[in-house]
């Protein structure tokens, strides 16, 4: 079901990319649904949604940046969502709670950030892939001003497949009251960063290492990793194999990486997984909760001395979590005892896990 279809908006004779025709289609669909079919679309200038148009994109509809820009696509609800009620021009209440972007694959190609969402109430983002964001995969709020709350983000898949983007962020928000469920971030230096509070992150999985160490090709790295993986499967992982991995170097996007960074208050991580990062959970602010979650460091990636939780917050609750130490060098916690509530957590080496906390923090899990 849609109101307009992109096939009805072909390129004009003088146009050399797809940005103008997609923008025309968006502008012709106020408060409606635009269908974008399968295909590769060259984006040489940024796309803007300012008329509450929703996008229904085929999973193989790819918006590929070909020039430098800030964002490939920006959504701005174009109203003062700081106020309790938004009105139409005729004075009636605007209350369309079904606005969305669904599907598609935005490849910023290292030239831009992928997607900005701003100024909306109960907006849905689902089943979308965000690749190779220069600064962000998904940015919620950012510098756009206004207010976005009750974002429902489901099956958002962020991944970098090209080198040279170290320091970027997969999912960033400085807005409140967002619900992020079943989101995956692969090979962004910071997976998820929340600079505002009251957000809920459920079953979000952050990992990295598919991009190679600097100076190596993706093919070389993939083959090297595969050979070492066979050693693990065959139970032939030796000190010699480990030394070879350490000499090869750490994958580019894992250097100084953080899976989850919480810089504000009352955010909740439930069922989340920090899977191979320099720091799993970096927590500031106060009254944040990490529950039913875990930390793991894939030793084949070459990271050592990783840290599961770095607590710089005024108050942190950690419950029912599982932490692993596959390299024998991974650390579980850094921070003050007085600022953490610790309950029902465990590790794969229970005795080492208990001894660590007793020695480092005089605190028993």
What are these language model-derived features?
Residues 68-93:
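Aromatic/His-enriched, Gly/Pro-containing loop or helix-boundary segments
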Residues 1-6, 349-365:
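Glycine-rich, low-complexity segments
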Residues 26-30, 48-50, 93-95, 118-119, ...:
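Flexible, charged surface loops at secondary-structure boundaries
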Residues 92-187:
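Right-handed parallel beta-helix
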Residues 36, 54-58, 81, 94-102, ...:
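All-beta strand scaffolds that present successive hydrophobic residues in beta-strands
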Residues 44-46, 59, 64-70, 109-115, ...:
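Short glycine/acidic-rich loop motifs that flank beta-strands on beta-rich extracellular proteins
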Residues 6-37:
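Acidic Gly/Asp/Thr-rich repetitive segments characteristic of extracellular carbohydrate-active
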Residues 19, 31-69, 106, 110:
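N-terminal extracellular ligand-recognition/capping segment immediately after the signal peptide
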């Amino acid at each position: 079901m849609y109101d307009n279809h992109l096939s009805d908006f072909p390129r004009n004779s003088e146009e050399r990319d797809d940005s103008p025709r997609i923008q025309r289609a968006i502008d012709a669909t106020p408060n409606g649904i635009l269908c974008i079919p399968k295909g590769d679309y060259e984006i040489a200038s940024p796309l803007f949604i300012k008329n509450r148009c929703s996008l229904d994109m085929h999973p193989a509809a790819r918006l590929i940046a070909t020039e430098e820009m800030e964002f490939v696509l920006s959504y701005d609800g174009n109203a003062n969502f700081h106020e309790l009620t938004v009105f139409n021009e005729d004075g009636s209440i605007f209350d369309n709670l079904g606005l969305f972007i669904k599907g598609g694959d935005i490849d910023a190609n290292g030239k831009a950030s992928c997607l900005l969402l701003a100024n909306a109430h109960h907006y849905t983002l689902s089943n979308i892939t965000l690749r190779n964001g220069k600064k962000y995969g998904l940015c919620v709020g950012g510098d756009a001003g206004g207010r976005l709350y009750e974002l429902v983000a489901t099956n958002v898949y962020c991944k970098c497949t090209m080198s040279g983007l170290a320091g970027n962020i997969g999912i960033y928000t400085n807005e409140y009251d967002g619900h992020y469920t079943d989101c995956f971030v692969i090979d962004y230096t910071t997976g998820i960063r929340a600079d505002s509070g009251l957000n809920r992150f459920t079953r979000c999985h952050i990992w990295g290492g598919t991009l190679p160490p600097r100076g190596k090709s993706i093919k070389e790295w993939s083959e090297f990793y595969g050979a070492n993986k066979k050693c693990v499967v065959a139970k032939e992982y030796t000190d010699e194999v480990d030394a070879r991995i350490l000499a090869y170097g750490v994958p580019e996007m894992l250097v100084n990486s953080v899976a989850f960074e919480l810089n504000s208050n009352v955010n909740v991580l439930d069922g989340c997984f920090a899977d191979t990062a320099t720091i799993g959970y970096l927590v500031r602010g106060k009254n944040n909760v990490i529950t039913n979650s875990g930390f793991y460091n894939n030793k084949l990636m070459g990271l050592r001395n990783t840290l599961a939780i770095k607590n710089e917050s005024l108050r942190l609750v950690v419950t029912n979590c599982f932490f692993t130490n596959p390299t024998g060098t991974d650390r579980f916690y850094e921070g003050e005892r007085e600022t953490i509530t610790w309950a029902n957590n465990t590790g794969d080496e229970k005795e080492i896990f208990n001894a660590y906390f007793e020695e480092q923090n005089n605190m028993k899990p």
